[in-house]
């Protein structure tokens, strides 16, 4: 028997909790058509100072879980995950921005092999998302696509369905609003099968709790550090290549000047030469640091390196087994150039 547990984290949502809970409960017949035998709805009151808990407790079909004090969006979701009894777990916000009517579509994908199904607000359906947040979500989705080497259109969607078994692979997760982008980042790097289903997005009920600047910074920091813990060379390697690219451009410019008969460098050319030298040294060192960190990550997790800068790692055998020929190559290169 397939059970779907839907978790709604709620903080000061007395005006909207009844409507969203009622809409979730109303999709039960469609869930059964999609292959879900039973659905449970958990509302996690995250220390609300209004009547959210009181209102939710009076809704038939709702299991209320309470935090004595506010712990954060992510903490409320994790409490719900721990209380859920279903092998499928879904969640959405309490503010009415996400359409629970799309849960059957998400569940079909999950029952057909996907391990994490994300309702994408950026994949074509009608969206009332503010322009600033739309730009931010596009940026984070593009960043995650680069870091995880898989196309992602919405890295921070708050409507998802996933199989319970993936929790052990994507934990730990943060307590704040950055839970969703970190979940996406971990899932990509853990090789979890992800699918996206286009969903509409509505204007929220009440005032938004999301700050574009503050939470955007937290999202970026969380995603970068999470990716670094799996594949450091993906980030450091790109930085190193960019630095060496700058050095290459400077070199081409100096070669161009020399080809045109310039034999004396002015102050700007000297500064460019210095920039090129610094960029070369910095690029090589940062790139090498990324490779070293990847090796340390593999040692820490006691697993072989699965990823590299452009996908699969360059060295399938441990890096220390490559030091001999790498050293000889370096010596020969030095003798030739010298």
Predicted segments, located by residue:
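Donor nucleotide-sugar binding loop of glycosyltransferases
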Residues: 13-16, 48, 99
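Hydrophobic helical membrane-anchoring modules
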Residues: 1, 178-338
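Short beta-strand/loop segment that forms part of the nucleotide-sugar
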Residues: 21, 32-47, 65-66
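Acceptor/aglycone-binding surface of glycosyltransferases and processive sugar-polymer synthases
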Residues: 65-83, 88-91, 97-177, 181, ...
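A conserved acidic beta->alpha catalytic loop
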Residues: 42-53, 96
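N-proximal low-complexity "stem/linker" segments adjacent to membrane-targeting elements
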Residues: 1-26, 36
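Hydrophobic/aromatic residues located in beta-strands of well-ordered beta-sheets
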Residues: 40-41, 64, 116, 194
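Cell-envelope/extracellular polymer assembly enzymes that use nucleotide-activated donors
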Residues: 3-5, 40, 182
